[in-house]
Amino acid sequence: MGKADKYWHIQMYKPEGKGGIEIDSMKMLQEPNPVIGTGEWDALDCIQFKDVENGTIVFVREGNKALALCEIIDEAFRSNELENKYYNTNYRHVKILAWAKDYKQPRPQLFSQGTFKSCKSSTEQYHYIDEWLKYIKIHGRRENATFSR
């Protein structure tokens, strides 16, 4: 993993947006082939989610709560089966690099609202993710780690 000029963060537990239904994002990450996802709407978040390169590091959260650090490993796709479960429209397969239970939570309000946002290297969000990646390098990742709330 080389040093990136930016990382991304995603929250996917409100696939219909504010005021809509809420899903358990952890279940998406615990699929046999873990996924992250977004809805389909006319916004930059959705376009960038579908276009971002494989190998991109993504911090997954529900509001201010960290869930996992992932790496995108496949192109964007749609799945009726996944959409029936999670109500998102667009999906990407990911490799789980680490679960948040094995690292510190971010400070409140560190990550902005929005579905899929970039974190440039000059931001505090970037440094949080970068420090987590360094922690993984030093302490290793737990291959078949399971998550418990």
Segments the model singles out, each with a brief description of its role:
Residues 1-50, 98-102, 123-125, 131, ...:
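Compositionally biased, charged N-terminal/linker segments
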Residues 10, 70-71:
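GIY-YIG nuclease signature motif recognition
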Residues 13-15, 61-65:
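Short, flexible beta-strand-to-coil junctions
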Residues 36-37, 59, 67:
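Hydrophobic beta-strand signal
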Residues 47-61:
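Short coil-to-beta transition motif at edge beta-strands of beta-rich domains
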Residues 65, 71-134:
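Aromatic- and Lys/Arg-enriched surface recognition patch
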